């Protein structure tokens, strides 16, 4: 049986994909994965991915940290004979009726795992995407009679997503983070240890700050400026030298991302202040050459500086507008 795990392009999508890949492989499944190219494929599952999976005789698609809004895409997958399992934590899409009531829409997958479903009795609703994937893995391991301790080991990765997804650190999120930090400080993962070395954390205690401001951004930089597959390969790498090469590459990418963000923000501030835009109710700034993957970061920094809603546009976005894309 061929299974493809399909990830949301982010650090939490990378983590979800990694732990699902490890777990499914442990259950003797034939697993491959797909993390989209941010520029070419955008976010989430799309028609081309589904058709390619069908052409490759894939049996099951499992989404990681996405899929709850992919109504049409999952319908297509079912029409093509694929089974679909959705693991997601995002809000359930809905249609608001004239009377103000809401009709919630769930994709017609074979299994849709999301604690925010209105018909879900799971008591904790604020899991991150990797947390939802972990809960799926726990149940999977029970079905395959795999020791619970093996699932618990995966919390060292879930902890990264808990911090970087900025979910509330309460209830299960806090429990997962606490246990994950214990595990990650004694990790045997060659890729993580290489990243600790590359970022100057080797021999130091890994804490919430380390995850949120050093490890997380380094993993995420590959998705922002290159391809998130690099981060996933790092976590899967078993050769120390190759892992260190990948870790160094990710660390350098993150430094590049920081510098590009700094330059973009400085340019945006110059535009705003030279045009007296700080009196506007909404700040809309066009930065022609800024990398589209950091436009959102710059917009956030502008919002923080001026305490106003901010939108940053760049060349690719304007090209889409000119082509009729809203």
Regions found by a protein language model. Give the residues of each.
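Active-site cavity-forming subdomains of large catalytic enzyme subunits
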Residues: 54-126, 130, 134-143, 153, ...
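Hydrophobic helix-and-loop "lid/oligomerization" segment in the mid-to-C-terminal part
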Residues: 1-60, 80, 98-100, 108, ...
């Amino acid at each position: 049986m061929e299974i493809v795990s399909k990830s949301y392009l982010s650090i939490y999508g990378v983590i979800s994909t990694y732990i699902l890949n490890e777990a499914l492989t442990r259950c003797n499944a034939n697993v491959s994965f797909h993390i989209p190219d941010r520029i070419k494929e955008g976010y989430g599952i799309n028609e081309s991915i589904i058709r390619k999976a069908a052409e490759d005789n894939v049996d099951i698609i499992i989404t990681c940290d996405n899929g709850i809004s992919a109504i049409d895409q999952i319908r297509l997958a079912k029409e093509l004979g694929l089974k679909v399992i959705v693991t997601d934590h995002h809000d359930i899409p809905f249609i608001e009726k004239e009377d103000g009531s809401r009709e919630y829409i769930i994709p017609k997958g074979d299994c849709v795992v999301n604690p925010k479903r209105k018909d879900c009795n799971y008591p904790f609703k604020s899991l991150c995407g990797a947390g939802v994937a972990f809960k799926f893995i726990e149940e999977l391991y029970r079905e395959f009679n795999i020791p619970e301790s093996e699932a618990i080991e995966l919390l060292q990765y879930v902890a990264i997503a808990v911090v970087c997804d900025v979910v509330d650190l309460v209830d299960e999120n806090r429990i997962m983070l606490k246990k994950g930090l214990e595990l990650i400080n004694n990790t045997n993962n060659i890729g993580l240890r290489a990243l600790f070395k590359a970022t100057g954390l080797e021999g130091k205690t890994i804490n919430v700050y380390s995850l949120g401001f050093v490890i997380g951004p380094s993993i995420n930089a590959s998705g922002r400026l290159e391809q998130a597959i690099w981060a996933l390969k790092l976590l899967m790498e078993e050769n120390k030298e190759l892992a260190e090469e990948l870790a160094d590459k990710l660390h350098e990418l993150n430094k590049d991302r920081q510098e590009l963000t700094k330059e973009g923000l400085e340019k945006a501030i110059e535009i705003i202040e030279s045009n007296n835009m700080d009196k506007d109710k909404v700040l809309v700034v066009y930065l022609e050459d800024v990398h589209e993957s950091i436009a959102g970061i710059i917009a956030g920094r502008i919002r923080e500086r001026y305490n106003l809603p901010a939108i940053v546009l760049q060349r690719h976005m304007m090209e889409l507008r000119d082509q009729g894309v809203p």
